[in-house]
Regions:
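AMP-forming adenylation/ATP pyrophosphatase catalytic core
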Residues: 2-225
């Protein structure tokens, strides 16, 4: 009893001591800085990684899994896109950071009609779309009467002109320039009017979606976390 209580106290103390360090390693998307983690001792790094899973309310990985995560994902070759599955999630690496990414049914090839009059629940638990009165980065021209609004996933167009860039560019290049991690590229809702791409929500508006008159709408995407 005393041993177990002491052990529990030590864990609680570790939580308290490591919490500020873990928070310092994380960004707004809760990804971890690999370079900083690499400076820690193995014991400390393992403890930080375990607490990272705990912060996400995930099942605790074993010591062996944590070691694999470090070797196979964090230390993978620079040009690799490594990932390791933990139950319903994957740990992935992008730009020297570790991300915990939920595994979802790929929504690519789904085309969802959206009448705009009501909010729209996205497939694969990707959140909810609705119109808002505020203007923001998802402010686009309003559709004309003969334009049907659909939501799609996964860019098929190769060449795009987006607001804020002068020339048309390859879609892959745009994702890279805007720092969108590869797995997010198929999870960002794309707004189409008929077959014309208007916007990738929270990311860019195309030339065709640019506001040119007072008729504009703003779409809010509430992502599920």
């Amino acid at each position: 009893e005393t041993g177990a209580a002491l052990c529990g106290e030590q864990e609680a103390l570790l939580d308290e001591l490591l919490e500020p360090e873990l928070n310092a390693l994380m960004d707004s998307e809760h990804s971890l800085d690999i370079k900083q983690l690499a400076l820690c001792s193995v014991i400390k790094r393992n403890a930080l990684l375990r607490r990272w899973f705990a912060q996400h309310n995930k099942t605790m990985p074993s010591r062996q899994q944590i070691l694999r995560l470090w070797q196979e994902v964090a230390l993978a070759k620079a040009d690799a896109e490594p990932k390791l599955q933990f139950y319903q999630d994957e740990v992935r690496r992008y730009k020297q950071r570790l991300y915990l990414v939920p595994i979802i049914d790929d929504p690519v090839n789904k085309i969802i009609e959206w009448p705009l009059t009501q909010s729209l629940s996205l497939p694969s638990g990707l959140g909810v779309l609705s119109l808002t009165t505020a203007t923001g980065k998802n402010t686009v021209r309003a559709p004309s009467k003969d334009e049907k609004v659909t939501v799609r996933f996964g860019l098929t167009q190769t060449s795009l002109r987006i607001v804020g860039r002068e020339h048309a560019r390859h879609s892959k290049k745009i994702w890279q320039e805007l720092d969108v991690a590869p797995w997010r590229r198929t999870r960002i809702p794309l707004i189409y009017y008929n077959d014309t791409l208007i916007a990738a929500l929270n990311t860019f508006v195309t030339f065709e979606g640019k506001v040119t008159s007072e008729y504009a709408i703003t779409i809010e995407w509430r992502e599920a976390h």
